[in-house]
Amino acid sequence: MAEVSSKELYKFKKTLKELSEKKGRGTELVSVYIPHDKQISDVGKQMRDELGQSANIKSKQTRKNVQSAIEVIMQRIRLFKAAPENGLVLFVGMIPRGGPGTEKMETYVFEPPEPITTYWYQCNNEFFLEPLEYMIEERETYGLAVIDRKEATIATLRGKKVNILNHLTSGVPGKHKAGGQSQRRFDRVIDLAAHEFKKRIGEHMNEDFLALEELEGVIIGGPGFTKEEFVKGDYLNYEIKDKIIATVDTSYTGEFGIREVIDKSADILNDLDVMQEKKVVQKFLHELVKDKGLASYGEREVRTNLIMGAVDTLLLSEDLTAMRKVFKCPSCGNEEEITVKSQSEADKLEKPCSNCGEILKEESSQTLIEDFVEKAEEMNSEVELISTETEEGMQLLRAFGGVAAILRYHVG
Protein backbone atom coordinates (compact mmCIF):
# COMPACT_ATOMS: atom_id res chain seq x y z
CA MET A 1 0.00 0.00 0.00
CA ALA A 2 1.01 3.66 -0.19
CA GLU A 3 3.65 4.81 2.28
CA VAL A 4 1.91 5.42 5.61
CA SER A 5 3.28 5.47 9.13
CA SER A 6 2.94 2.44 11.42
CA LYS A 7 0.59 4.42 13.64
CA GLU A 8 -1.63 5.48 10.73
CA LEU A 9 -1.75 1.90 9.46
CA TYR A 10 -2.61 0.57 12.92
CA LYS A 11 -5.37 3.19 13.35
CA PHE A 12 -6.74 2.45 9.88
CA LYS A 13 -6.88 -1.30 10.61
CA LYS A 14 -8.51 -0.56 13.98
CA THR A 15 -11.15 1.64 12.33
CA LEU A 16 -11.90 -1.06 9.74
CA LYS A 17 -12.30 -3.67 12.46
CA GLU A 18 -14.72 -1.41 14.35
CA LEU A 19 -16.69 -0.66 11.17
CA SER A 20 -16.91 -4.37 10.31
CA GLU A 21 -18.66 -4.99 13.63
CA LYS A 22 -21.39 -2.39 12.95
CA LYS A 23 -24.71 -3.94 11.89
CA GLY A 24 -27.99 -2.26 11.00
CA ARG A 25 -31.49 -3.62 11.58
CA GLY A 26 -32.29 -3.39 7.88
CA THR A 27 -30.53 -2.34 4.68
CA GLU A 28 -30.04 1.15 6.07
CA LEU A 29 -26.27 1.57 6.46
CA VAL A 30 -25.02 3.79 3.63
CA SER A 31 -21.50 3.57 2.17
CA VAL A 32 -20.18 6.12 -0.34
CA TYR A 33 -16.75 6.06 -2.06
CA ILE A 34 -15.80 9.23 -3.97
CA PRO A 35 -12.67 9.19 -6.21
CA HIS A 36 -10.51 12.34 -6.38
CA ASP A 37 -11.60 13.11 -9.95
CA LYS A 38 -15.33 12.81 -9.17
CA GLN A 39 -17.04 16.21 -8.97
CA ILE A 40 -18.59 16.83 -5.54
CA SER A 41 -21.50 18.58 -7.29
CA ASP A 42 -22.19 15.36 -9.25
CA VAL A 43 -22.17 13.35 -6.02
CA GLY A 44 -24.61 15.85 -4.49
CA LYS A 45 -26.96 15.41 -7.46
CA GLN A 46 -26.73 11.61 -7.19
CA MET A 47 -27.48 11.81 -3.47
CA ARG A 48 -30.60 13.87 -4.20
CA ASP A 49 -31.64 11.22 -6.74
CA GLU A 50 -31.04 8.46 -4.16
CA LEU A 51 -33.07 10.44 -1.63
CA GLY A 52 -35.98 10.46 -4.08
CA GLN A 53 -35.56 6.75 -4.85
CA SER A 54 -35.54 5.89 -1.14
CA ALA A 55 -39.19 7.00 -0.91
CA ASN A 56 -40.01 3.63 -2.52
CA ILE A 57 -38.60 1.61 0.42
CA LYS A 58 -41.52 -0.34 1.89
CA SER A 59 -40.47 -0.40 5.55
CA LYS A 60 -41.31 2.96 7.13
CA GLN A 61 -38.46 2.74 9.66
CA THR A 62 -35.86 1.65 7.09
CA ARG A 63 -37.03 4.38 4.70
CA LYS A 64 -36.70 7.02 7.43
CA ASN A 65 -33.23 5.80 8.47
CA VAL A 66 -31.90 5.65 4.89
CA GLN A 67 -33.21 9.14 4.15
CA SER A 68 -31.64 10.48 7.35
CA ALA A 69 -28.29 8.90 6.41
CA ILE A 70 -28.39 10.37 2.88
CA GLU A 71 -29.18 13.82 4.30
CA VAL A 72 -26.16 13.56 6.62
CA ILE A 73 -23.97 12.61 3.62
CA MET A 74 -25.27 15.59 1.64
CA GLN A 75 -24.44 17.90 4.56
CA ARG A 76 -20.93 16.46 4.93
CA ILE A 77 -19.91 16.60 1.26
CA ARG A 78 -20.91 20.29 1.12
CA LEU A 79 -17.87 20.91 3.35
CA PHE A 80 -15.57 19.79 0.50
CA LYS A 81 -14.81 21.76 -2.66
CA ALA A 82 -13.18 18.63 -4.05
CA ALA A 83 -12.42 15.13 -2.86
CA PRO A 84 -8.93 14.76 -1.29
CA GLU A 85 -6.06 13.29 -3.31
CA ASN A 86 -6.92 9.69 -2.34
CA GLY A 87 -10.66 10.30 -2.51
CA LEU A 88 -13.26 10.41 0.24
CA VAL A 89 -15.13 7.64 2.07
CA LEU A 90 -18.36 8.13 4.02
CA PHE A 91 -20.12 5.56 6.20
CA VAL A 92 -23.39 6.71 7.74
CA GLY A 93 -26.24 4.87 9.40
CA MET A 94 -28.38 4.13 12.44
CA ILE A 95 -26.56 1.61 14.66
CA PRO A 96 -28.59 -0.15 17.38
CA ARG A 97 -27.15 -0.07 20.90
CA GLY A 98 -29.58 -2.69 22.19
CA GLY A 99 -33.26 -3.43 21.53
CA PRO A 100 -35.62 -1.52 19.21
CA GLY A 101 -35.51 2.24 19.70
CA THR A 102 -31.87 2.32 20.83
CA GLU A 103 -30.47 3.24 17.38
CA LYS A 104 -28.05 6.16 17.11
CA MET A 105 -26.81 7.85 13.95
CA GLU A 106 -23.09 7.20 13.42
CA THR A 107 -20.98 9.02 10.83
CA TYR A 108 -17.47 8.21 9.61
CA VAL A 109 -15.75 10.41 7.03
CA PHE A 110 -12.08 10.04 6.05
CA GLU A 111 -9.50 9.94 3.29
CA PRO A 112 -8.22 6.37 2.69
CA PRO A 113 -4.48 5.55 2.56
CA GLU A 114 -4.64 4.66 -1.15
CA PRO A 115 -6.51 6.27 -4.06
CA ILE A 116 -10.10 5.21 -4.71
CA THR A 117 -10.62 4.46 -8.40
CA THR A 118 -14.36 3.71 -8.53
CA TYR A 119 -17.41 5.62 -7.31
CA TRP A 120 -19.63 3.49 -5.05
CA TYR A 121 -22.98 4.06 -3.39
CA GLN A 122 -24.39 1.15 -1.42
CA CYS A 123 -27.14 0.50 1.15
CA ASN A 124 -26.95 -2.67 3.20
CA ASN A 125 -27.24 -3.98 6.76
CA GLU A 126 -23.45 -3.54 7.06
CA PHE A 127 -20.93 -1.08 5.69
CA PHE A 128 -19.25 -1.88 2.35
CA LEU A 129 -15.58 -2.28 3.31
CA GLU A 130 -14.07 -4.48 0.58
CA PRO A 131 -12.13 -1.71 -1.25
CA LEU A 132 -10.57 -0.56 2.04
CA GLU A 133 -9.80 -4.10 3.21
CA TYR A 134 -7.96 -4.68 -0.06
CA MET A 135 -5.73 -1.68 0.70
CA ILE A 136 -4.35 -3.24 3.88
CA GLU A 137 -3.72 -6.69 2.47
CA GLU A 138 -0.09 -7.76 2.50
CA ARG A 139 0.94 -7.31 -1.09
CA GLU A 140 4.47 -8.56 -1.43
CA THR A 141 5.43 -9.63 -4.93
CA TYR A 142 5.86 -13.33 -5.69
CA GLY A 143 7.30 -14.77 -8.90
CA LEU A 144 5.32 -17.61 -10.49
CA ALA A 145 6.09 -19.98 -13.35
CA VAL A 146 4.37 -23.03 -14.84
CA ILE A 147 6.59 -25.23 -16.95
CA ASP A 148 6.39 -28.35 -19.09
CA ARG A 149 8.25 -29.46 -22.22
CA LYS A 150 5.90 -27.67 -24.58
CA GLU A 151 5.33 -24.29 -22.95
CA ALA A 152 6.07 -22.04 -19.99
CA THR A 153 4.26 -19.06 -18.49
CA ILE A 154 5.94 -16.52 -16.20
CA ALA A 155 3.91 -14.21 -13.96
CA THR A 156 3.90 -12.16 -10.76
CA LEU A 157 1.38 -12.12 -7.93
CA ARG A 158 0.92 -8.92 -5.90
CA GLY A 159 -2.00 -9.04 -3.50
CA LYS A 160 -4.82 -10.36 -5.68
CA LYS A 161 -3.40 -9.01 -8.93
CA VAL A 162 -1.80 -11.48 -11.35
CA ASN A 163 0.42 -10.05 -14.08
CA ILE A 164 1.40 -12.41 -16.91
CA LEU A 165 4.92 -11.40 -17.96
CA ASN A 166 5.84 -13.99 -20.59
CA HIS A 167 4.48 -17.03 -22.40
CA LEU A 168 7.04 -19.23 -24.16
CA THR A 169 6.64 -22.24 -26.46
CA SER A 170 9.37 -24.82 -26.96
CA GLY A 171 9.14 -26.47 -30.34
CA VAL A 172 10.46 -29.63 -28.64
CA PRO A 173 9.40 -32.60 -30.85
CA GLY A 174 7.09 -35.27 -29.53
CA LYS A 175 7.91 -38.98 -29.18
CA HIS A 176 9.48 -40.73 -32.17
CA LYS A 177 8.70 -44.36 -33.05
CA ALA A 178 11.87 -45.19 -34.94
CA GLY A 179 14.14 -47.84 -33.43
CA GLY A 180 17.88 -48.42 -33.11
CA GLN A 181 20.33 -45.61 -33.78
CA SER A 182 17.65 -43.37 -35.24
CA GLN A 183 15.73 -43.55 -31.97
CA ARG A 184 18.83 -42.71 -29.91
CA ARG A 185 19.73 -39.87 -32.27
CA PHE A 186 16.23 -38.49 -32.05
CA ASP A 187 16.20 -38.78 -28.24
CA ARG A 188 19.40 -36.71 -28.13
CA VAL A 189 17.77 -34.07 -30.35
CA ILE A 190 14.74 -33.97 -28.03
CA ASP A 191 16.92 -33.73 -24.90
CA LEU A 192 19.01 -30.93 -26.43
CA ALA A 193 15.89 -29.01 -27.49
CA ALA A 194 14.40 -29.45 -23.99
CA HIS A 195 17.65 -28.22 -22.43
CA GLU A 196 17.70 -25.15 -24.70
CA PHE A 197 14.07 -24.44 -23.84
CA LYS A 198 14.83 -24.59 -20.10
CA LYS A 199 17.78 -22.23 -20.67
CA ARG A 200 15.42 -19.83 -22.44
CA ILE A 201 12.90 -20.03 -19.57
CA GLY A 202 15.69 -19.30 -17.07
CA GLU A 203 16.88 -16.28 -19.06
CA HIS A 204 13.38 -14.81 -19.15
CA MET A 205 12.77 -15.50 -15.44
CA ASN A 206 16.11 -13.90 -14.54
CA GLU A 207 15.31 -10.84 -16.62
CA ASP A 208 11.74 -10.51 -15.30
CA PHE A 209 12.34 -11.28 -11.61
CA LEU A 210 15.70 -9.55 -11.03
CA ALA A 211 14.04 -6.30 -12.12
CA LEU A 212 11.58 -6.52 -9.20
CA GLU A 213 12.59 -4.49 -6.14
CA GLU A 214 10.78 -6.58 -3.52
CA LEU A 215 10.54 -10.19 -4.68
CA GLU A 216 9.52 -12.23 -1.63
CA GLY A 217 9.66 -15.67 -3.18
CA VAL A 218 9.28 -17.82 -6.30
CA ILE A 219 6.86 -20.72 -6.81
CA ILE A 220 7.23 -23.07 -9.77
CA GLY A 221 4.48 -25.39 -10.97
CA GLY A 222 3.74 -27.73 -13.82
CA PRO A 223 2.06 -31.02 -14.74
CA GLY A 224 5.16 -33.21 -15.18
CA PHE A 225 8.80 -33.67 -14.15
CA THR A 226 10.14 -30.75 -16.21
CA LYS A 227 9.70 -28.33 -13.29
CA GLU A 228 11.87 -30.51 -11.01
CA GLU A 229 14.55 -30.83 -13.72
CA PHE A 230 14.44 -27.06 -14.17
CA VAL A 231 14.78 -26.33 -10.44
CA LYS A 232 17.65 -28.80 -10.01
CA GLY A 233 19.46 -27.60 -13.14
CA ASP A 234 21.70 -24.57 -13.54
CA TYR A 235 19.17 -22.37 -15.33
CA LEU A 236 18.47 -19.58 -12.84
CA ASN A 237 20.51 -16.76 -11.36
CA TYR A 238 21.45 -17.71 -7.79
CA GLU A 239 19.45 -14.75 -6.38
CA ILE A 240 16.28 -16.10 -7.98
CA LYS A 241 17.06 -19.74 -7.23
CA ASP A 242 17.58 -18.95 -3.53
CA LYS A 243 14.05 -17.51 -3.42
CA ILE A 244 12.26 -20.65 -4.65
CA ILE A 245 9.89 -21.48 -1.79
CA ALA A 246 7.89 -24.31 -3.36
CA THR A 247 7.19 -26.45 -6.41
CA VAL A 248 3.61 -27.57 -6.96
CA ASP A 249 1.93 -30.07 -9.27
CA THR A 250 -0.64 -28.62 -11.64
CA SER A 251 -3.00 -30.08 -14.23
CA TYR A 252 -2.55 -27.15 -16.61
CA THR A 253 0.04 -24.81 -18.06
CA GLY A 254 -0.55 -21.31 -19.37
CA GLU A 255 -2.71 -18.82 -17.49
CA PHE A 256 -4.92 -21.60 -16.09
CA GLY A 257 -1.78 -23.19 -14.68
CA ILE A 258 -0.75 -19.91 -13.02
CA ARG A 259 -4.19 -19.70 -11.36
CA GLU A 260 -3.81 -23.29 -10.19
CA VAL A 261 -0.38 -22.50 -8.69
CA ILE A 262 -1.92 -19.61 -6.74
CA ASP A 263 -4.80 -21.75 -5.46
CA LYS A 264 -2.47 -24.54 -4.36
CA SER A 265 -0.01 -22.12 -2.71
CA ALA A 266 -2.49 -20.24 -0.48
CA ASP A 267 -1.31 -22.02 2.67
CA ILE A 268 2.35 -21.58 1.71
CA LEU A 269 1.96 -17.82 1.21
CA ASN A 270 0.06 -17.46 4.48
CA ASP A 271 2.76 -19.43 6.32
CA LEU A 272 5.42 -16.99 5.06
CA ASP A 273 3.84 -14.12 7.02
CA VAL A 274 3.71 -16.36 10.08
CA MET A 275 7.36 -17.33 9.57
CA GLN A 276 8.39 -13.66 9.52
CA GLU A 277 6.68 -13.16 12.89
CA LYS A 278 8.31 -16.27 14.31
CA LYS A 279 11.71 -15.12 13.03
CA VAL A 280 11.61 -11.71 14.75
CA VAL A 281 10.41 -13.15 18.10
CA GLN A 282 13.09 -15.85 17.92
CA LYS A 283 15.72 -13.16 17.33
CA PHE A 284 14.52 -11.37 20.49
CA LEU A 285 14.64 -14.64 22.48
CA HIS A 286 18.14 -15.35 21.17
CA GLU A 287 19.33 -11.93 22.39
CA LEU A 288 17.59 -12.45 25.71
CA VAL A 289 19.66 -15.49 26.71
CA LYS A 290 23.01 -13.97 25.69
CA ASP A 291 25.33 -12.20 28.12
CA LYS A 292 24.85 -8.49 27.44
CA GLY A 293 22.24 -9.45 24.86
CA LEU A 294 20.35 -6.75 22.98
CA ALA A 295 16.92 -7.55 24.44
CA SER A 296 14.46 -5.65 26.59
CA TYR A 297 10.92 -6.47 27.71
CA GLY A 298 8.09 -5.18 29.86
CA GLU A 299 6.25 -1.90 29.35
CA ARG A 300 8.31 0.25 31.73
CA GLU A 301 11.76 -0.99 30.66
CA VAL A 302 10.99 -0.88 26.94
CA ARG A 303 9.48 2.61 27.26
CA THR A 304 12.66 3.86 28.98
CA ASN A 305 14.89 2.33 26.30
CA LEU A 306 12.65 3.69 23.54
CA ILE A 307 12.85 7.24 24.88
CA MET A 308 16.66 6.86 25.11
CA GLY A 309 16.76 5.93 21.41
CA ALA A 310 18.16 2.48 22.20
CA VAL A 311 15.41 0.43 20.50
CA ASP A 312 16.08 -0.96 17.04
CA THR A 313 12.92 -3.09 16.69
CA LEU A 314 9.83 -2.80 18.88
CA LEU A 315 7.71 -5.95 19.26
CA LEU A 316 4.07 -5.45 20.23
CA SER A 317 1.40 -8.11 20.58
CA GLU A 318 -1.70 -7.38 18.48
CA ASP A 319 -3.75 -8.63 21.45
CA LEU A 320 -2.62 -5.82 23.77
CA THR A 321 -5.79 -4.21 25.16
CA ALA A 322 -4.30 -1.80 27.72
CA MET A 323 -4.75 1.96 27.37
CA ARG A 324 -2.36 4.85 27.95
CA LYS A 325 -4.05 7.86 29.52
CA VAL A 326 -2.98 11.38 30.39
CA PHE A 327 -4.40 12.71 33.67
CA LYS A 328 -4.28 16.41 34.57
CA CYS A 329 -4.53 18.13 37.92
CA PRO A 330 -7.41 20.66 37.90
CA SER A 331 -5.58 22.79 40.48
CA CYS A 332 -1.93 23.07 39.46
CA GLY A 333 -2.06 21.76 35.87
CA ASN A 334 0.42 18.93 36.54
CA GLU A 335 0.09 16.08 33.99
CA GLU A 336 0.81 12.39 34.60
CA GLU A 337 0.69 9.44 32.19
CA ILE A 338 -0.82 6.19 33.46
CA THR A 339 -1.38 2.77 31.84
CA VAL A 340 -4.69 1.07 32.67
CA LYS A 341 -6.07 -2.31 31.64
CA SER A 342 -9.49 -0.94 30.70
CA GLN A 343 -11.71 2.15 30.66
CA SER A 344 -13.61 0.86 33.69
CA GLU A 345 -10.33 0.77 35.64
CA ALA A 346 -9.64 4.36 34.59
CA ASP A 347 -13.14 5.45 35.68
CA LYS A 348 -12.54 4.05 39.18
CA LEU A 349 -9.07 5.56 39.46
CA GLU A 350 -8.66 8.25 42.09
CA LYS A 351 -5.00 9.19 41.87
CA PRO A 352 -3.80 12.25 43.80
CA CYS A 353 -1.57 14.80 42.09
CA SER A 354 2.08 14.27 43.04
CA ASN A 355 2.45 18.07 43.40
CA CYS A 356 -0.59 19.23 45.37
CA GLY A 357 -2.61 16.12 46.26
CA GLU A 358 -5.72 17.10 44.24
CA ILE A 359 -7.44 14.16 42.47
CA LEU A 360 -6.33 13.97 38.83
CA LYS A 361 -8.85 14.15 35.96
CA GLU A 362 -8.55 12.25 32.67
CA GLU A 363 -7.33 14.54 29.89
CA SER A 364 -6.72 12.24 26.89
CA SER A 365 -6.54 8.57 25.97
CA GLN A 366 -5.18 6.18 23.35
CA THR A 367 -4.40 2.49 23.16
CA LEU A 368 -1.06 1.32 24.51
CA ILE A 369 -0.18 0.13 20.99
CA GLU A 370 -0.83 3.61 19.54
CA ASP A 371 1.26 5.21 22.29
CA PHE A 372 4.24 2.89 21.69
CA VAL A 373 4.03 3.12 17.89
CA GLU A 374 3.99 6.92 18.09
CA LYS A 375 7.12 6.98 20.25
CA ALA A 376 8.84 4.40 18.02
CA GLU A 377 8.28 6.57 14.96
CA GLU A 378 9.76 9.58 16.75
CA MET A 379 12.93 7.54 17.46
CA ASN A 380 13.07 5.87 13.99
CA SER A 381 12.58 2.43 15.54
CA GLU A 382 11.07 -0.41 13.50
CA VAL A 383 7.70 -1.74 14.72
CA GLU A 384 6.57 -5.37 14.43
CA LEU A 385 2.96 -6.13 15.38
CA ILE A 386 2.93 -9.80 16.38
CA SER A 387 -0.21 -11.97 16.20
CA THR A 388 -0.95 -14.76 18.67
CA GLU A 389 -1.30 -17.34 15.88
CA THR A 390 2.12 -18.82 16.65
CA GLU A 391 3.68 -20.28 19.78
CA GLU A 392 6.20 -17.42 19.73
CA GLY A 393 3.39 -14.84 19.50
CA MET A 394 1.62 -16.37 22.50
CA GLN A 395 4.92 -16.42 24.40
CA LEU A 396 5.45 -12.71 23.71
CA LEU A 397 2.01 -11.90 25.13
CA ARG A 398 1.98 -14.23 28.13
CA ALA A 399 5.62 -14.26 29.25
CA PHE A 400 6.65 -10.71 28.34
CA GLY A 401 3.40 -8.76 28.66
CA GLY A 402 3.14 -8.23 24.91
CA VAL A 403 5.89 -5.59 24.87
CA ALA A 404 9.51 -6.35 23.96
CA ALA A 405 12.40 -4.84 22.01
CA ILE A 406 15.59 -5.70 20.18
CA LEU A 407 18.11 -2.98 21.07
CA ARG A 408 20.60 -1.03 18.98
CA TYR A 409 23.20 -1.24 21.72
CA HIS A 410 23.54 -2.78 25.17
CA VAL A 411 22.01 -0.73 27.97
CA GLY A 412 23.77 -1.25 31.29
Curated annotation (Swiss-Prot):
It comes from the Archaea. GO terms for molecular function: translation release factor activity, codon specific. It is found in: Cytoplasm. GO terms for cellular component: cytoplasm. Keywords: Cytoplasm, Protein biosynthesis. It holds the Pfam family eRF1_3. The keyword Ion transport does not apply. PANTHER family: PEPTIDE CHAIN RELEASE FACTOR SUBUNIT 1. Directs the termination of nascent peptide synthesis (translation) in response to the termination codons UAA, UAG and UGA. HAMAP family: Rel_fact_arch_1. Belongs to the eukaryotic release factor 1 family. Heterodimer of two subunits, one of which binds GTP. This is Peptide chain release factor subunit 1. It comes from Methanobrevibacter smithii (strain ATCC 35061 / DSM 861 / OCM 144 / PS). The lineage of its organism: Archaea, Methanobacteriati, Methanobacteriota, Methanomada group, Methanobacteria.
